Amino acid sequence: MMIGNLHVFPNGRIERERKPKCARCRNHGLVSWLKGHKRHCKYKECACEKCNLIAERQRVMAAQVALKRRQATEDAIALGLRVVAGQAIDRLPQGPVWNTAGGEDEDMDYLDEEIEEKPPTPVSEELVPLKRKKVEETYELSSFSPIELLMTLFCEHEKHVLELVLEACHGNVLQAIEHFANVRRVKNINQMKLFAAATRMDHVFPNMTNFILPKQSFLIDSLLEQPTFPVSSQASTSTKTCDSSSVDSISPNSSTFESS
C-alpha cells in the first residue's frame, strides 16, 4: 500500500521510498537528491581524499558493470548456439548481470547518474513481425535432430557416414560440422589443382588428346571381318593371267579334254 511516497507494510511499519543522494555532497555534510544534480554539484571538481576515493570507486563499479554486460552478451550467444544445435534446455540460466549485491546501492548512487542510459527507441509495427519471424525460425531450427541437421548441410555424404562422425565427436554437432566443412574445403582445393594441371597440359601439348583418345569407337565385330590389303597392278594382272590359263586348261575345246 502506497501513501504518497510512503510504503505501508501490513504490520503497520512505514518505510519511505528510497531516493539516491549525491555522495560528494554527503562527504561535505550536505544532502542533495541525485536526480538532475550532476551538472549543478559544486563539489564535482573537488580533489579531497574522500572525493578521490569516490571517483576511484566509480571507476571500479563502471568496470564491473561493463564486465557483467559482456558476460551477459556471451551467455546469450552461447544460448543461441545451443538452440541451433538442438540441445534441450529445461530453463534459462541466470546470467551474472543480475547477481548484484544489495549493499552496493549507496556506493552506486553517483554512478547511476553518470551512466546515461539510452532512451528506449520506439519499435515500429513493421519490425515486430520480423522479430517474431526470427524467433519462429529459431524454434524451427531447434526441432531438427543432430543427424537431420548434418544431412541438410552435407547432403553429399551418406547417412551412416554422418552417424559415424557424429559418434566419434561424442554427439558434438558443432565439431562434426567443422570436420565436414574441412573435408569439403580440401576436396574443393584438390579439384582446383586437378583442373589447373589439366589446363596447363592442354597448353603445353595441344594435340595430346589425338594420341590418347581413339577417333572411332572399337567394336568386337571388326576383329571378325577379313582384312583388306591393297593389291598392286602387276599382281592383279598376274592373277588375271593365272585365272584365264586355268580356265583354258579345263575348257571343253582344249586338247586335253579331247584326248581324254
Swiss-Prot record:
Keyword Hydrolase carried by entry: no
Annotated stretches, region: Disordered: 232-260
Domain DMA: 144-180
Compositional bias segments (type: Low complexity): 244-260
One Pfam family of this chain: DM
Distribution of this protein across tissues and organs: Expressed in PHA and PHB phasmid sensory neuron pairs of adult hermaphrodites, but not adult males. Expressed in sexually non-dimorphic manner in some head sensory neurons (AFD, AWB, AWC, ASE, ASG, ASH, BAG), a single pharyngeal neuron (I5) and a number of MS blastomere derived cells - the head mesodermal cell, (hmc), a single pharyngeal muscle (pm8), a pharyngeal gland cell pair (g2L/R) and four of the six pharyngeal intestinal valve cells.
Keyword terms of this UniProt record: Developmental protein, DNA-binding, Metal-binding, Nucleus, Transcription, Transcription regulation, Zinc
Subcellular location: Nucleus
Disruption phenotype: Causes embryonic lethality. Abnormal anterior intestinal function.
Listed Polar residues bias regions: 232-243
SUPFAM superfamilies: Cysteine-rich DNA binding domain, (DM domain)
GO molecular function (one): DNA-binding transcription factor activity, RNA polymerase II-specific
DNA-binding region: 22-69
SMART domains with a match to the protein in the record: DM (SM00301)
Domain notes: DMA domain may interact with ubiquitin.
Function: Probable transcription factor, involved in regulation of sexually dimorphic synaptic connectivity and behavior. Promotes pruning of phasmid neuron synaptic connections in hermaphrodite animals during sexual maturation.
Subunit structure, interactors included: Monomer. May interact with ubiquitin; the interaction may stabilize dmd-4, especially in neurons.
Name the UniProt record assigns to this protein: Doublesex- and mab-3-related transcription factor dmd-4
Organism field: Caenorhabditis elegans
